[in-house]
Amino acid sequence: MNMLNKKIYAEMYGPTVGDSVRLADTDLWVKIEKDFTIYGEEVKFGGGKVIRDGMGQGQMNNKECVDLVLTNAIIIDYWGVIKADIGINNGRIVGIGKSGNPDIQPGVTIYIGPGTEVISAEGKIVTAGGIDVHVHFICPQQIEEALSSGMTTLIGGGTGPTTGSNATTCTPGVWFISRMLQAADALPINIGFTGKGSSALPESLIEQIHAGAIGLKVHEDWGATPATIDCCLNVADNFDVQVSIHTDTLNESGFLETTISAIKNRTIHAYHVEGAGGGHSPDIIRICELNNVLPSSTNPTLPYTINTVDEHLDMMMVCHNLNCNLPEDIAFAESRIRRETIAAEDILHDLGALSMISSDSQAMGRIGETILRTWQTAHKMKLQRGSLLGDDQYNDNTRIKRYIAKYTINPAITHGIAHEVGSVEIGKLADLVLWSPVFFGVKPELIVKGGMIVSSVMGDPNASIPTPQPVYYRLMFGSYDLAKCATRMTFISQSSYDVGVVENLRLNSLIGISKRCRNIKKDHMINNNLKPVMEVDPQTYEVRANGELLVCEPVSVVPMSQRYFLF
């Protein structure tokens, strides 16, 4: 058999087992662990290429062949780094393996026929669409920003640029939940809305769950007292929905121990652990030692840089409706911003003690930068802490699997939607992001939503080819009209589905049910389930995990930044 040299092979079909690929301009390298394609039987589309009738394309009908195949993709997910073809049917992933024509090719598991469309992924990286579970729905324009960064699912609350939504991720009450569910039908992205959980009596919380809320949010700005926490969790346990909490920064109704006692070992998603977004000052970070708490942090403090602290005071004043002329408001804001705990946040993510990363969109966070800042943090930690156990030169797979899980599978597990989204696995919605390695984590090439491209880098529509400038992200056919509703999903509670919310509101989108939220523990957080014994010095704010002082320096330069955003 004539063999291609590695350079020519990689240029034609992409890298294979044992090859390493650099991620953007970081110091992170991914190494391919397995190749499902077969040497000499690879399929590729184009003039003079393999996917032609009677060659790599068979004559099967629609029932036998896939609707869409991504060829020779490098798949990066929490479960591994492989090279494979990806088959999609009816908007869902149906195959990860070897595509082609089974009549003449060996080992074919994904059938290509006359009804099959192709996305050439040779040399490209495919990841699951990101999941942001800390979204303030302040304006609908966020959706395009999120999509063009690689996000395909948003969970949070809000009703637009109201004072309440600027500060909290709550869509309060039956009327607003109904209107936001109807609005979501027009948005080409998966969405779930969290209702307001700050109530010491259950009736209004139950109403919101019946109205279609995917879960509830307890926030200090509405009240995060022991009574509201206990009531909200009681309701959540009865209806199998998740509770997210932003705890009491001022310690007015109790300290961290008071909140932990009110939680009573029940499952809860804790926001802002740590960062500078709020929560019991100064030791909310200790909550990541508990098995019943699923901890996340937000992107404005990631990674810790020389500018992180300075930018936060003004952000805090605006988002939480504070007055810069009132000393008590200044003191409130400053109590949240601590260099020591912000630095510890980076390290705890690298240890796998913090399980998720989200945005806090337009409310002290940036909806288009969650993926970007996740990989900047991973890069910073590799430089400052070295390779993780199991990694070596040109192989950071352990660290990469840890960090990608923070914005894909773990948020999905936390909010009971992992049966639908969160990973590149058979049976799940085909929410996939295609990246050129040099732009990985920064600017995706195209975003597939429910099996159809919804957003892509695109050149001048009047040009003779797709690539001439100006080149920027544009919404594609999958984001329009009924196609959008057939490829996006609205997530609601089981009880709201049972009482007929979908029919009553005339929702047209795919419907996903949040389920199995209440028995999840931190042990279920994939690649991110460390539960260290935490200590925080109340005077110096020094943070220790299992007795080790968590200290890292702020960086003055980060990758994936200016060289990618000159234009």
UniProtKB/Swiss-Prot annotation:
Reactions performed catalytically: urea + 2 H2O + H(+) = hydrogencarbonate + 2 NH4(+)
Keyword match Hydrolase: yes
Highest rank taxon of the organism: Bacteria
Domain Urease residues, every copy: 129-567
Cofactor(s) listed in the protein's UniProt record: Ni cation
Oligomeric and partner information: Heterotrimer of UreA (gamma), UreB (beta) and UreC (alpha) subunits. Three heterotrimers associate to form the active enzyme.
Name by which UniProt lists this protein: Urease subunit alpha
